[in-house]
UniProtKB/Swiss-Prot annotation:
Protein name, as recorded: Protein translocase subunit SecA
Cysteines engaged in disulfide bonds, as pairs: none
One Gene Ontology term, aspect cellular component: cell envelope Sec protein transport complex
Family the entry assigns: Belongs to the SecA family.
UniProt source species: Haemophilus influenzae (strain PittEE)
Cofactor(s) needed for function: Zn(2+)
Amino acid sequence: MSILTRIFGSRNERVLRKLKKQVVKINKMEPAFEALSDDELKAKTQEFRDRLSGGETLQQILPEAFATVREASKRVLGMRHFDVQLIGGMVLTNRCIAEMRTGEGKTLTATLPCYLIALEGKGVHVVTVNDYLARRDAETNRPLFEFLGMSVGVNIPGLSPEEKREAYAADITYATNSELGFDYLRDNLAHSKEERFQRTLGYALVDEVDSILIDEARTPLIISGQAEKSSELYIAVNKLIPSLIKQEKEDTEEYQGEGDFTLDLKSKQAHLTERGQEKVEDWLIAQGLMPEGDSLYSPSRIVLLHHVMAALRAHTLFEKDVDYIVKDGEIVIVDEHTGRTMAGRRWSDGLHQAIEAKEGVDVKSENQTVASISYQNYFRLYERLAGMTGTADTEAFEFQQIYGLETVVIPTNRPMIRDDRTDVMFENEQYKFNAIIEDIKDCVERQQPVLVGTISVEKSEELSKALDKAGIKHNVLNAKFHQQEAEIVAEAGFPSAVTIATNMAGRGTDIILGGNWKAQAAKLENPTQEQIEALKAEWEKNHEIVMKAGGLHIIGTERHESRRIDNQLRGRSGRQGDPGSSRFYLSLEDGLMRIYLNEGKRNLMRKAFTVAGEAMESKMLAKVIASAQAKVEAFHFDGRKNLLEYDDVANDQRHAIYEQRNYLLDNDDISETINAIRHDVFNGVIDQYIPPQSLEEQWDIKGLEERLSQEFGMELPISNWLEEDNNLHEESLRERIVEIAEKEYKEKEALVGEDAMHHFEKGVMLQTLDELWKEHLASMDYLRQGIHLRGYAQKDPKQEYKKESFRMFTEMLDSLKHHVIMTLTRVRVRTQEEMEEAERARQEMATRINQNNLPVDENSQTTQNSETEDYSDRRIGRNEPCPCGSGKKYKHCHGSRVARQ
């Protein structure tokens, strides 16, 4: 600790000192608010709104607003906010993250900033990690908010559009992070303003903020449509991979291995060696999937390479019951940070299809991205952002760097007395498991409940089998049994209870020492008062037993890549001043040690074990683990920061496109925009054939006539104009062409009416914009995947990506204008007389064909035999609709056939 810190205190301490002055002010108001009647207390909400309208700020009314919520909570919920919860609430009204230890009442704390900021009327979003927590927190706090005149909504998957709109219209909306992000994307795919759900993104309060803004940061939210089917190719290529041999390190000038591929476990990437490439190519040629003499890396084989690499990654880097589970014939992803299954989510880049082929389940078609956004960029759209979690301080630098959020550590209401014991290291996993089982046996004998944390479904099941063998009764909480999560967590605090859990560890639900009598009461159908009293008495007895045994004991079966996840596991114990203990058991075979400690360090540590099954505890061990975790955290931070720098480029473009879409949805008449675009497009086309300020000899009039005819359906005799009028120069010629285009368009508008034409313009613009944006997203994906290769040419990939993506975006906007004007100019508007004439001609023709016993289809398309139908008795203009009813111009339909005859 520096001298300055000793004198002035840390920044965190200085912030807390300042906030404690506000707490004193709020506490002084308590007697006055206690004296208010219910109606007077309820009336405070309207009073605060009026004061805000009158020019007061949120900070000015904060003490009174917090005092109001505290008093209402006492009356409605029977809970009084602690002073530390008031401090947490004040931190959350600013752009800050409140680190509040597990069990300190984050749900109740959130009511303070939510009420205060909802007074502005812009809406408040309380963001949770799953549906269960969103529903639970909303129902818990609903009586309090409704007492104060605030409406509460819940936004979870599966709601109808009306229910969603109602949820978003509420003053305070509880929602999952994924549903908020997807609704934002859906809003920007809507075809009318009535289809949109979200209003202004004002204030988001993110619960478990580290899970959402750090762990989920690399996961983009994607809405996709079906792309071309290629499942057969995944199944074919899947047969090749088992024959490939792994090589420990990449080939260099000094080292030439004999394997077919190498793995980078840190970044989860696989690479073919030269030997592997040849082997794959030989196999593909033998299977008839690639012609002889071709290369896997040739441009024409890029799709085949994509399938091979996806299959290689699926077999070598993604494990069943670790990264995913197979359930009901489908591959379900397991969240590496929480251990929860993520139903409905699919890996991109063909990886999910490759894993489906590997596991022998139905291979679904690949998808094409229609809209996407990362959590990083979605949550940065909010005017105000705040978050709370039990473990944020280790990631404080990242929160500040990426989101501009300062982390404030909130003191606990009662001192934390948990005993965090030194880590124990073993030579291998078997010795480690033996020690864990002995520790569990000891706890069970002393009637101390145990929570054992594992990093994967696979490890939880291995340990479960070992406990079964040892005859120890236990519960398992992992991705396969997540439906029973609340029930298992409710039982985890009973005397001698043993619970094995993946990283999820019942996060968001307290483990109550002695068990949860309320959960037991909920199982009973209409419990009597006597039954409830009996359950309470039983709980008090069990609670006393567990307290004497030392509270909840936490066992970590290995260190996670992030210290934060380890702290979350430890945080299940020692809540609100309860006793508790924790210890991590490690082995040299653990993933963290294998991937992030070099072979030299591992060998050095291996030599320290002189007796089989011996345990090692030392300060050096703690330093080695801390060093490995710091490396991993730095690696992942760089990855997230790098991803954000690339995504920021796409984000600027996304913002521009969505702004354009919203303009289109909010305006019924976009004719001015269409007119401006028409001028740009026609002038752009004319420039290509009549360069500005050029000589007449440089003009390509024939090319211009053909282009205008082909793309815009305009038959203009420009050559004749020039012959007839010697004074027709470049500028007047441009004006004449544009005037004719506008005149023809006005004639169409007069036929159908202004409103109908404006509606059509809007529809064409939206449809074209969506289609081109979808294609642009696919192009951006391909660019992103290959841009690193520019590094070999001594170019900065990030700068190249920015440059290329800007060029592609500009081309897309030009293409948008061109396609819209081309569609609007070519559209054929029929008069009532023309439609009636076409219908008569169609019926006459059908009658003639039927008389000759020739088939005619329902769409009135002419058959091969009807090509010689004689229309010479009726004079038909070349540009008139063909009387056969095909919808084509006569010159492009039967007119051309008559001419040939």
